[in-house]
């Protein structure tokens, strides 16, 4: 498969090299951490059930406390271990990617570097690659952890009552199109944001270099029009993202937390008709309406993934540049000959055409333009 056609996650692991094993170990720890999410839910459910039925004993209370405490401790320990492993692998991978870009820039034609501002290249090396750290060290392990917990709880609910368990999934099914819409909007708006950030970095470098003149003439930031406009453009870009995605985020939260509106009426009806006992009704009223809230951070992750993939595209653009291949033997003759050279500033009108020039070894020639 061509490198440009590789899936983003696979490409990130390819760039990580041998450090990908830290990232995979981090994902495994995050998966184990997600398995322990069910502990507190089950423990508190058994405690509430025992209190309502009047069967609570000291041993039952102790068992619930131990279950909640042990599963919570194990979850936090595994989550912390996942974070350590992911950061170790992520920062090593970022170092490797930055080295790849620097080595690439050292071999590309000089025209590429001269045609791009310092701020644009700085944006790729700093901001765009830094977004990859957020993806590798946080988003991927968190995605696994956030998905594992609800899946385990859903499987547990399926063993209790299949119809009510399936009903509890309705809010999630309604939310999937919302999440996809947010990801698409972020992906469409991020190129504009990256462009404004690159312009901002370019103007910032120029502003810092001219700081002595600004102080000498007692000029403020408002008098430096390009600097002010760059700040406003960056602000406008992020305000646009907020206005486009905020309504969808509100819809996402409302739908995800609407399980109670479905489970309580339907579960209550089944309970009144004797189809389910009170403990099952309590279980779905408590756990069935809450376990999907574990997926709330996924909405933020969709935006983070969009930013990371946008940064990856910038990195891929540089890595895909053609390189200047040397390796030929040094010529014995040091003469310089230009034959039939033409040049145009705009690509349409030639300002230099059919120019021929011969400079012998050791000869000095000055070219003066009119």
Segment roles from a protein language model:
Residues 36-45, 71-114, 118, 122, ...:
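Juxtamembrane helix-loop junctions of ABC transporter transmembrane domains
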Residues 219, 243, 291-318:
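Cytosolic ends of transmembrane helices, especially the final helix of ABC transmembrane type-1 domains
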Residues 67-79, 172-176, 180, 245-259, ...:
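Hydrophobic alpha-helical segments in the permease module
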Residues 1-37, 53-64, 82-86, 90, ...:
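Membrane-integrated ABC transporters
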Residues 18, 22-33, 64, 68, ...:
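Transmembrane helices of ABC transporter permease
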Residues 23-78, 159-163, 278:
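Transmembrane helix-loop-helix hairpins at lipid-water interfaces of multipass membrane proteins
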Residues 13-21, 110-111, 127-136, 140, ...:
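An intracellular "coupling" helix at the cytosolic face of ABC transporter transmembrane type-1 domains
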Residues 332-370:
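ABC-type nucleotide-binding domain
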């Amino acid at each position: 498969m061509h490198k440009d056609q590789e899936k983003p996650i696979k490409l990130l692991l390819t760039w990580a090299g041998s450090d990908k094993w830290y990232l995979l170990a981090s994902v495994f720890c995050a998966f184990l951490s997600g398995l322990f999410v069910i502990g507190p839910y089950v423990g508190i459910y058994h405690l509430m059930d025992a209190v309502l039925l009047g069967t609570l004993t000291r041993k039952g209370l102790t068992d619930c406390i131990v279950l909640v405490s042990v599963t919570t401790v194990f979850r936090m320990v595994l989550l912390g271990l996942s974070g350590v492993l992911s950061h170790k692998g992520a920062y090593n991978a970022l170092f490797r990617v930055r080295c790849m870009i620097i080595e690439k820039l050292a071999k590309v034609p000089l025209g590429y570097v001269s045609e791009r501002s310092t701020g644009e290249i700085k944006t790729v090396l700093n901001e765009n690659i830094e977004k990859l750290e957020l993806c590798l060290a946080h988003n991927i392990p968190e995605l696994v952890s956030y998905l594992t917990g609800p899946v385990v709880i859903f499987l547990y609910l399926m063993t209790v009552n299949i119809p009510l368990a399936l009903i509890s999934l309705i809010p999630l099914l309604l939310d999937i199109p919302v999440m996809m819409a947010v990801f698409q909007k972020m992906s469409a708006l991020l190129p504009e944001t990256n462009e404004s950030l690159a312009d901002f970095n370019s103007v910032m470098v120029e502003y810092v270099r001219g700081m002595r003149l600004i102080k000498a003439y007692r000029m403020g930031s408002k008098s430096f029009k390009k600097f002010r406009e760059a700040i406003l453009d960056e602000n406008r870009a992020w305000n646009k993202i907020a206005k486009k995605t905020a309504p969808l985020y509100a819809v996402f939260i409302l739908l995800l937390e609407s399980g109670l509106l479905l489970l309580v009426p339907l579960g209550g009806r089944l309970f009144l008709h004797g189809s389910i006992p009170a403990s099952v009704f309590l279980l779905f009223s408590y756990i069935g309406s809450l376990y999907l809230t574990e997926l709330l951070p996924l909405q933020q992750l969709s935006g983070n993934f969009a930013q990371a993939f946008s940064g990856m595209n910038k990195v891929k653009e540089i890595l895909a540049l053609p390189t200047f291949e040397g390796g030929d033997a040094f010529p014995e003759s040091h003469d310089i000959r230009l034959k039939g050279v033409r040049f145009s500033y705009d690509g349409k009108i030639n300002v230099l055409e059919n120019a021929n020039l011969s400079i012998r070894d050791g000869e000095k020639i000055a070219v003066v333009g009119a």
